[in-house]
């Protein structure tokens, strides 16, 4: 769950990442061992982004390492993914999102609809945005009760939560 002020921060960070990196799609996903939920996205509604990047984001969060894919059509993680086969995601760069204590929260990822060679500078910018985001939100603060509108519930296995602007 996120507080409304946190949601505004998340949305600003995803929009900032899109502008700074010049990409059409950005996703901020909170990822658990068996599930993930896109907390904020730019370029596409969150439910679509979750379907597009879930496999990649889980790998980044689990490994606590970045994942950089220049052309997912030729990458073992992406070649058989419907989003890649349909041309919705071709290039992907994702970094883990850590809280101030070093705990893994999820991922911040950027995607493109065409092959893209990610530069060192772009990856450093992505890391910078993720670092600032991880330190800008008080992850231990109480979240809004589930009964409040536009809330975010902790995801259950196999179920994402729609983006507030979608419902």
Describe the function of each predicted region.
Residues 28, 102-103:
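Glycine-biased flexible loop/turn sites that connect beta-strands or occur in inter-domain linkers
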Residues 107-116:
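Short beta-strand-to-loop transition segments that serve as allosteric relay/switch motifs
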Residues 25, 31, 35-41, 46-90:
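Regulatory sensory and allosteric helical modules in signal-transduction proteins
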Residues 90-99:
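A short, aliphatic-rich beta-strand micro-motif
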Residues 1-53, 123, 127-129, 136-145, ...:
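Intrinsically disordered, low-complexity terminal regulatory regions
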Residues 25, 94, 107:
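Short hydrophobic/aromatic beta-strand element in the GNAT-like acyltransferase core
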Residues 106-107, 123:
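PAS (Per-ARNT-Sim) sensory domains
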């Amino acid at each position: 769950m996120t507080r409304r002020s946190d949601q505004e921060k998340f949305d600003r960070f995803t929009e900032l990442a899109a502008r700074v990196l010049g990409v059409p799609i950005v996703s901020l996903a909170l990822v658990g061992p068996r599930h993930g939920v896109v907390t904020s996205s730019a370029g596409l509604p969150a439910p679509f982004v979750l379907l597009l990047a879930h496999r990649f984001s889980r790998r980044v969060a689990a490994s606590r390492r970045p994942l950089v894919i220049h052309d997912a059509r030729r990458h073992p993680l992406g070649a058989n993914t419907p989003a890649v086969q349909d041309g919705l995601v071709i290039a992907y760069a994702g970094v883990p999102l850590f809280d101030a204590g070093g705990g893994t929260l999820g991922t911040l990822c950027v995607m493109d609809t065409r092959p893209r060679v990610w530069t060192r500078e772009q990856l450093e910018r992505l890391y910078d945005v993720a670092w600032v985001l991880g330190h800008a939100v008080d992850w231990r603060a109480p979240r809004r009760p589930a009964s409040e509108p536009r809330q975010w519930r902790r995801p259950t296995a196999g179920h994402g939560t729609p983006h507030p602007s979608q419902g």
